[in-house]
Amino acid sequence: MRKVYGIQLLLLMSASLLLAVAPVRSQEKKPVVIAIPVGLSGVNSVVAPAVVQSAELAADELNAKGGILGQPVKVVPLDDESGPAGAVKAFNTGIRQDKADVIITMETSAARNAGAPIAERAKVPFIYTSFYEGRACGEYLFVNAWVPEQVVPPLIKFMTDEKKVKRWSAVGSDYAFGRGMIEAAKKTIKDMGGIILGEEYQPLQQSDWTAIISKIRAANPDGIIYSTSGGGPNIDFLKQLKAAGLTMPIGSLSIDELTAEAGGNAAEGVYYTGDYFTGIDNPENKRFLEAMKKKFGAELKTPNALSEQEYDGLHAYAMAAEKAGTTNADAIIKVLPTVVFEGPRGSVQMNKQNHAPLPIYLAQVQADGKTKVLRDFGLIDPGDQCPTR
């Protein structure tokens, strides 16, 4: 009888132990969820797949090393439809339904402006990986891509000094990024003694640039500086400009390698500055490109200055979580500015008012749509983006 009681007691203790351990094991296996609201449809649909691919490679690399704090990394792409209404839906879905630990993504400025307050209210860290017009600030918002202070002066100076552009036409998409970048360009042009002959803006969803191109032809500038939204609008504008026979030097504040390549020869000759190009010659970039080719093969979307930063963002977040010993949001935002990720662009640290000093390069689109790096300007500071931080 005692033997039976002993066995029953042993079974009861074993069951209790299993029940006690089960929640711990479940907690250990709970994934770290990274939401990626991005323009899978709309104007950003040209570049969005490359953003997702960068995230997937980073997640694979992290999971191969045991994940984040021993938990698997799960990326959740969400279509923000390249605009504010879609961003509101995507951010709410990512935070409420998918229980995102962090949001890491590239978006239009309109989408970011709609989504960022949702992340801020929910106290979810948001690493914004897109170049943008600057001055977006929040306790939970971090930016690892360029702002106007880093790319506009080098581009305008090059075109002024070496392409002899003094009289300019300025063209932009009619939203925060387009107008913000053109404002920065106008200031730099005037500071360098140049003249703005005309300034025109196109509604974001409109693809016919005929009226604006007619005004450029009438103004007869030495050169053009433009800033559309990322992706397709660049190609629409440049194709129509080429068809109109306008051949003056062009500087872009919105194009990227993937978009230029997708446009065939439409962007041939266009100059642009940025913090990432596939032609950057360093070991980490070579390793990154090889890993991307190995993972995606024929499906690979050319890594570019709107997608590579996603890869950096995931790794920086992982480093912050490991350093903090937790994925708790308040702990993460304290540690995030202190981590330095050595990646394809070089050393990146979001320690300047939640923005990052970045290496900046000058490049030009070739006849086949490929981009050639022409010059390395070195590390450039983002300036005062959020002075109260």
Feature locations, PLM:
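Extracytosolic ligand-binding ectodomains
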Residues: 2-389
